[in-house]
Structure formats: structure tokens, C-alpha cells
Amino acid sequence: MPRANEIKKGMAVNLNGKLLLVKDIDVQSPSARGASTLYKMRFTDIRSGMKVEERFKGDEIIDTISLSRRQVTFSYIDGDEYVFMDDEDYTPYNFKREQIEDELLFLPEGGIPGIQVLTMDGQILALELPQTVDMEIVETTPGIKGASASARTKPAAMSTGLIIQVPEYLSNGDKIRIHIPERRYMSRAD
């Protein structure tokens, strides 16, 4: 079994009888000598959908669970359910809107490549997005000529309702690359 310092985002763990999916990890290194590094992990309870937060020392042993990952493509919306199709055997995977509310902000019409469904023993657990997504700015203040030298930012809205900070020189219609885990602008898209 791995130690807390070996746990990565996207892994599933068994903690106090609960199945938890690691969503985020913050590493805190204390300044005192001899103090061990603390790992603050944010989880989503796979069964209930509740958010859970725990702290671990780097050498604590954590029980991990092996998950199956299937490559999928967004297919269609059926009422309040979103249907994703398996890329190999066309198995449909249904998610209620509440289950994937955060992920929907990064899913433009037509979907994006690199989406995976996490399953365990045939049970659908979660939807996992790639690290980056290319989206088009639909609403922002007009770009300022000559502003490329400054590091100032402004809010920009995407078609999905996502709002992030972008450099001042960008304007409506520009395609940008967004880093999904940090919800931040990376660069212009090709």
C-alpha cells in the first residue's frame, strides 16, 4: 500500500470504510526541523457525492483501490442526464447534472477529446477530464492595443458559463487554452 506522499490526484482510496476519489492535494512543509510534511487532501465520496477533507503525514499508509478507466466521448443530453459513449464498445454511461456540475463548465458543445469514465466492478464512479481544454471567449471587455507587455488581466466568459482571468489583449472570439485543474488561462489555442 502506498504512503500519503505517493498519492496522486484521480486515485481512489478506502478511508474509514468510505470509497473516496482524490480531487486535490495541498502539500504543507513545516519550517520546524524534524517535522514531517503534511498532505491536505480533498476527496469526493464516490457513493454519496459529499466532499471530504483529510490531513496526512507523508509516511502514513493509505489503502488505495484499483479503478478501471474507459475512454469516452460526450454523446447527448437526455433530460437532466448527460450520456457519454465508450469509444471502443459504445457502452453508454449516464451522469446526472448534479454529479458532474463542475466538469460541465469545461465541456463545450460537441465535447472534447480525452474524457475518461472511472468504474469499479461495473459501477460508474466519476468523470475525469483531460488537463487542458481549448475554448472560445464569448464575452469580455474589448482588447487594449499594446497591452501585450503588461501582465494585467480581465474576466472572460466562455460559452459554458465558465469565467476565468485572461490577459487584457484578448477579445471576443479568441480561442484560448485553459488548464482545467487550476481553472486558469494558459495560452492562445491553435
Swiss-Prot record:
Q: Which domain of life is it from?
A: Bacteria
State the Gene Ontology BP annotations. peptide biosynthetic process
UniProt GO molecular function? translation elongation factor activity
**Entries under SUPFAM superfamilies matching the protein:** Nucleic acid-binding proteins (SSF50249), Translation proteins SH3-like domain (SSF50104)
Sorted alphabetically, the Gene Ontology cellular component annotations on this record are: cytoplasm
Q: What CDD domains does the record tag this protein with? A: S1_EF-P_repeat_1, S1_EF-P_repeat_2
Which InterPro entries does this chain map to? Elong-fact-P_C, NA-bd_OB-fold, Rib_uL2_dom2, Transl_elong_fac_P/YeiP, Transl_elong_KOW-like, Transl_elong_p-like_YeiP, Transl_elong_P/YeiP_cen, Transl_elong_P/YeiP_CS
NCBIfam families hit by this protein: PRK00529.1 (NF001810), PRK04542.1 (NF003392), yeiP (TIGR02178)
Of which family is this protein a member? Answer: Belongs to the elongation factor P family.
The protein's matches in HAMAP family, at most eight in alphabetical order, are given as:
EFP
- The protein, known as: Elongation factor P-like protein
Organism field? Erwinia tasmaniensis (strain DSM 17950 / CFBP 7177 / CIP 109463 / NCPPB 4357 / Et1/99)
Organism placement in taxonomy = Bacteria, Pseudomonadati, Pseudomonadota, Gammaproteobacteria, Enterobacterales
